[in-house]
């Protein structure tokens, strides 16, 4: 456990936050706020930082790559490459990537099921021809024995 002494946190807006002394086991910066007041008596920030009067919230834009454009088309977000704007929100890219990931998983599930049926059909055909792993192994070992016997005869001559 750590003792956190009375700490001061300076915010960028010209205010100071005091935190009460307390015992904190993991996160020493967390704690109840005790008081907030301006940093200087004049009310201006001594560091010279002035906050902007008006803050505009513009969503972040992202320029999609060729691969991202293909994903946007494949997931049905846009009908053609020409319809895709030059800048798109990152959330749109993330959503389309997740949809593409799910579609790819469904395709892999389908291919796995098709492969299982293909293995079943080929196994039934092998049974009709009386082929099995045991018969293949016995034939291979018999061939090895014949080769070993021929090699022993050629050595003795």
From Swiss-Prot:
Pfam families in alphabetical order: DUF1075
One GO cellular component term noted in the UniProt record for this chain: membrane
Annotated gene: Fam162b
Family: Belongs to the UPF0389 family.
Keyword Cell wall biogenesis/degradation: no
Subcellular location: Membrane
Protein name: Protein FAM162B
Native organism: Mus musculus (Mouse)
UniProt-listed InterPro entries: DUF1075
Membrane topology: Single-pass membrane protein
């Amino acid at each position: 456990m750590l003792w956190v002494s009375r700490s001061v946190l300076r915010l960028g807006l010209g205010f100071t936050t005091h935190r009460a002394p307390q015992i904190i086991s993991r996160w020493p910066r967390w704690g109840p706020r005790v008081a907030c007041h301006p940093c200087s008596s004049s009310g201006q920030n001594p560091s010279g930082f002035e906050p902007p009067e008006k803050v505009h919230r513009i969503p972040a834009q992202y320029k999609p790559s060729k691969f991202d454009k293909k994903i946007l088309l494949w997931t049905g977000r846009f009908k053609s490459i020409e319809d895709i704007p030059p800048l798109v929100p990152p959330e749109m890219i993330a959503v389309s990537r997740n949809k593409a990931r799910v579609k790819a998983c469904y395709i892999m599930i389908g291919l796995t099921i098709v492969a299982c049926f293909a293995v079943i059909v080929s196994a039934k055909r092998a049974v009709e021809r009386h082929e099995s792993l045991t018969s293949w192994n016995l034939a291979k070992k018999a061939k090895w024995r014949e080769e070993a016997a021929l090699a022993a005869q050629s050595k003795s001559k």
